[in-house]
Regions:
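Membrane-embedded alpha-helical segments of integral membrane proteins
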Residues: 46-104
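Active-site recognition of the HExxH zinc-binding catalytic motif
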Residues: 84, 254-266, 270-273, 277
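Transmembrane alpha-helices and immediately adjacent membrane-cytoplasm interface residues
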Residues: 92, 98-101, 111-143
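Membrane-interface segments at or immediately adjacent to transmembrane helices
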Residues: 134-204
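Post-HExxH zinc-binding segment in Zn-dependent metallohydrolases
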Residues: 164, 267-310
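Auxiliary, metal-adjacent structural segments of Zn-dependent hydrolase domains
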Residues: 176-245, 249
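Pan-zinc metallopeptidase signature
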Residues: 319-383
Length: 383
């Protein structure tokens, strides 16, 4: 075999053509072909990453979150929000077809395959940021509302836990008898339409954008997200939120509201939990209020010593104790897959996008609720 002495010569390049062809070495070697359109996607992804870092929060908040993104939200919901088929199925089908075509092009060489693969990643990254991801650059809800976590101490958390406990007792007492049975706790039908108006009203109360009709789907199979310690996820490339079908009915109101808040452009996890709490608290539906109160109580309980929580649980009405038991039993059906890896990766992702607390940001909701109620202690807010 003749050795390759240098990398030479022939370069045909035009962004109006499908491919760029390099001839490497002698004429006996196969030309290296690069997929041109993939270079465009790669460049767009790099540009998105750069401008995300260099432009200030005031820009993203005004021009993207309250401007460009609102237009995207309205257009998407008008065109695709009424589809009975979750967009995740359609997007995954497109990815599978594109992957099959990519494998079928292996005869064009490794340069081509790698350029196509990187182009695919670039397309997903670009769509992520331009369709939603730039919301990570917005001014945080905590800053909008003037919250300061340093102003909340241990005694405040204890008082908030007691308040959340009292609310849970009250909401459970207000349930109709048929909603206190196991079949309701586990299998009552709860869908995104049941929460949308509550979420929009909560956002309006906070003077935040709320146009559009965000969908939150419950795709098959049960447990797919729960096995990754995740109850729900918003996927920007689909324009829709998703919750695990394996969740109990009592867990769904808060989780749907959380993912719907993401769909309206809120990126911070603690802020989405706060909006979910507010939406459920002010709902006219007793099941939504009860489900929201239970989920929020669990967040508050996570901030307390075990003995304090254990002592409280035994004083709850039967429906609350039964709901807590059923949730724990349901969690055991879906054991975590690589929990440490998942936590490390996701926490790193959140911090990379400006969420300083990482996974701990979810529990910021307790501090946010405590400070919100203190600022609005005139009785006009939900207790």
């Amino acid at each position: 075999m003749q050795s390759c002495k240098f990398i030479s010569t022939s370069l045909t390049m035009s962004f109006f053509k499908e491919n760029i062809t390099f001839r490497v070495g002698s004429n006996s070697l196969r030309p290296a072909v690069i997929h041109t359109r993939s270079l465009v996607w790669i460049a767009a992804a790099i540009l998105a990453l750069i401008i995300k870092e260099i432009l200030p929060a005031s820009f993203w908040d005004h021009w993207y979150y309250k401007g460009f993104f609102v237009g995207i939200r309205q257009a998407y919901d008008f065109l695709l929000g009424w589809s009975p088929v979750p967009m995740i199925y359609i997007v995954l089908s497109i990815i599978l077809v594109r992957t099959a075509r990519w494998i079928g092009d292996r005869s064009k060489g490794w340069f081509y395959l790698m350029s196509r693969a990187l182009g695919g990643v670039g397309a997903l990254v670009t769509l992520f940021y331009f369709s939603w991801g730039f919301n990570y650059g917005q001014i945080s809800l905590q800053e909008r509302l003037g919250f300061d976590r340093s102003l909340t101490d241990k005694e405040d958390i204890e008082a908030e836990f007691k308040r959340a406990t009292d609310v849970l007792r009250r909401e459970s007492a207000g349930l109709p008898t048929d909603l206190t049975r196991d079949n309701a706790i586990v299998g009552l039908k709860v869908v995104d339409h049941d929460l949308r108006q509550d979420v929009k009203e909560a956002l309006a109360k906070l003077n935040m954008p709320h146009s559009g009709r965000v969908r939150v789907r419950q795709p098959w199979p049960d447990g797919f997200l729960l096995r990754w310690s995740t109850a729900g996820i918003y996927i920007p490339q689909t324009g829709e939120g998703h919750i695990d079908r394996g969740l109990l009915a009592v867990q769904k109101p808060f989780t749907i509201a959380h993912e719907m808040a993401h769909g309206y452009g809120v990126a911070d996890e603690g802020a989405c939990n706060f909006i979910a709490w507010l939406a459920c608290s002010q709902s006219r539906d007793p099941w939504v209020r009860f489900g929201g109160a239970l989920t929020y109580w669990r967040y508050a309980a996570a901030e307390m010593p075990y003995d304090s929580v254990s002592n409280v649980i035994h004083t709850f009405p039967p429906v609350v104790m039964r709901a807590i038991t059923l949730v724990k039993e349901n969690d055991k059906k879906y054991p975590d897959i690589l929990p440490r890896v998942r936590d490390a990766v996701y926490s790193s992702y959140l911090k990379r996008h400006g969420v300083k607390e990482g996974l701990r940001s979810y529990n910021e909701v307790v501090i946010m609720v405590q400070q919100y109620l203190r600022k609005n202690s005139n009785g006009s807010m939900p207790e």
